[in-house]
Curated annotation (Swiss-Prot):
Gene: ftsL
GO biological process, one term: FtsZ-dependent cytokinesis
Source taxon at top rank: Bacteria
Matches recorded under HAMAP family: FtsL (MF_00910)
Protein name: Cell division protein FtsL
Organism: Bordetella pertussis (strain Tohama I / ATCC BAA-589 / NCTC 13251)
Length: 92
């Protein structure tokens, strides 16, 4: 009878250790899941911000303003356009 009790006690200890280990792993996975979800939210927010920034940078009004203010460009008008004709012999 003592031998059976010892085997049952050992199996009970192994079962308890296995339960503690599985609970610990479950908690670790839950924490990792939370971190991954937070990272996914951050990435989604950054993606939306970048989409808005790209749309802003591609706007024609912004490009026109930058050309006029920063590069000092002016719109072309026909009377200021100079047309150059290539000689009949071609380029040399």
């Amino acid at each position: 009878m003592g031998r059976i009790s010892l085997i049952v006690a050992a199996l009970l200890m192994l079962s308890a250790i296995s339960l503690v280990t599985s609970r610990y792993q479950s908690r670790q996975l839950f924490i990792e899941l939370g971190r991954s979800q937070a990272e996914a939210r951050d990435l989604d927010t950054n993606w939306r911000r970048l989409q808005l920034e790209r749309a802003e940078l591609a706007r024609n009004a912004r490009i026109d303003r930058a050309a006029r203010d920063d590069l000092k460009m002016i719109p072309i008008v026909p009377d200021r356009t100079l047309y150059m004709n290539q000689p009949a012999g071609g380029a040399q």
